[in-house]
Every structure is written in C-alpha cells, then in structure tokens.
Amino acid sequence: MEPVKNLARLSRTLGYEFTNQELLVQALTHRSAANKHNERLEFLGDSILSIVISDALYHQFPKATEGDLSRMRATLVKGETLTLIAKEFKLGDYLFLGPGELKSGGFRRESILADAVEAIIGAVYLDANMQACETLLLSWYKVRLDEIKPGINQKDPKTILQEYLQGYKKPLPDYQVVQVDGEAHDQTFTVECRIQDLDEVVTGVGSSRRKAEQLAAAQILELINK
C-alpha cells in the first residue's frame, strides 16, 4: 500500500484536516525510513496528551484524589491504550517504514504505533494550536473518559476479561501465540485470543507475549461492550 495516496482518508478518520500535509507525513515517518522522522513530534505530542488528559480528568472528577487522578491518567496515556487508538485508526496502513522494519512487521509493532499517535498529536499542535489538539483528543478519548472511574484499581485488560467471564461462569480466554518475528533482542509476538460465544478471533501484536495478550484482551473487551 502506498501511504501518500491515502492521507486524505486518514485525515477523515482522525477527524482533522492538516493545512501543512508535510507535518502529517513526518508524523507517520519512522526513523528507519528517513532523516526527517517523527521522534521530535512524538516528544511534543506526549506532553500535550498528558496535559489535555490531566485537565479533562481534573474537571470531570472534582472530588478525586491526586492518586486516583494519576492512576486514571496513566491508564489513558499508556502505550497499550495508544496502540489500541492507532489500531482503531488503522494507522499501520499509513506508516513510512524502512525496509528492515517493513520486513519484521513494524507496522504492527505497538511501540511504533503508539509513538505515531503521539507524533500526530504534536503535528496537529504545530499545524494549528493547543485548542485544536484538545478538541481532537477529547473526541478520540470520549468513550474511554466516559468509562473510566476513580477509586478503582486500574486493572489490565486480561484481568478485566477474566473476571468478566468468571462472573458469567464461562470458560477463560484461549490465548495462542501464532507467530514470532525478529531477532531475540527485538521480537514481535502475534497472539490470537478466543472466547466462548464470540465467533470472531482477535489478534494482538506486541514486543512480548504478555503485551500481545493484553492487546488482544482489550480488543475482545471492546467487542463485548459494543
């Protein structure tokens, strides 16, 4: 797939039209593909995401403690959440990667996907302003902000899914590693997850088996909650 031809489609999916398309291209460019890559934009986007989510939680939960606010923010801005957002946007289809990353499945690697989301946030800030970033991020996070609650230990997706199934006296999820790519120090795991009463088989891809299972479980939870 040639990413450049699909930038208009991606902009519609993101909900933002760039004035300077080069910023979007840079946000999608991994360091393996070009000298003008997305790492500086990622640095900027990481800070913007943190302050927007912090502000949203502060006003949404006026009685929450600092500890609760910190835990909720950590849940919303962590790499696994950003990877899920990237998958919702099918961001892997638009990334510019070097030959080595392409061969090793970099378009599915959670760290690359999460970094690209943050880079896009940074690109929107430079293309427009902070208000545009806030409006866009609140639209991306609407469902997650509606669902999150203070005073609750922010459990990981595997634990939530397991407890959900146990509550209905159903069998536990079946996780199977179906593929391992890359060298020992930089591997990518592909895990399939199946549960009873759900025909769809969900796939998670991560830098460890555990991370891949967590991503698969999170996608199952999203299907259940639809």
UniProtKB/Swiss-Prot annotation:
Keywords: Cytoplasm, Endonuclease, Hydrolase, Magnesium, Metal-binding, mRNA processing, Nuclease, RNA-binding, rRNA processing, rRNA-binding, tRNA processing. Its main location: cytoplasm. Residues 156-226 form the DRBM domain. It is found in: Cytoplasm. It comes from the Bacteria. Mg(2+) binds at E42, D115, E118. One of its GO terms (molecular function) is rRNA binding. GO terms for biological process: mRNA processing; regulation of gene expression; rRNA processing; tRNA processing. Residues 7-129 form the RNase III domain. Its cofactor is Mg(2+). It catalyses: Endonucleolytic cleavage to 5'-phosphomonoester. The active site is at D46, E118. One of its GO terms (cellular component) is cytoplasm. It holds the Pfam family dsrm. Its EC number is 3.1.26.3. Belongs to the ribonuclease III family. PANTHER family: RIBONUCLEASE 3, RIBONUCLEASE III. NCBIfam families: RNaseIII (TIGR02191). Digests double-stranded RNA. Involved in the processing of primary rRNA transcript to yield the immediate precursors to the large and small rRNAs (23S and 16S). Processes some mRNAs, and tRNAs when they are encoded in the rRNA operon. Processes pre-crRNA and tracrRNA of type II CRISPR loci if present in the organism. Homodimer. This is Ribonuclease 3. It comes from Shewanella denitrificans (strain OS217 / ATCC BAA-1090 / DSM 15013).
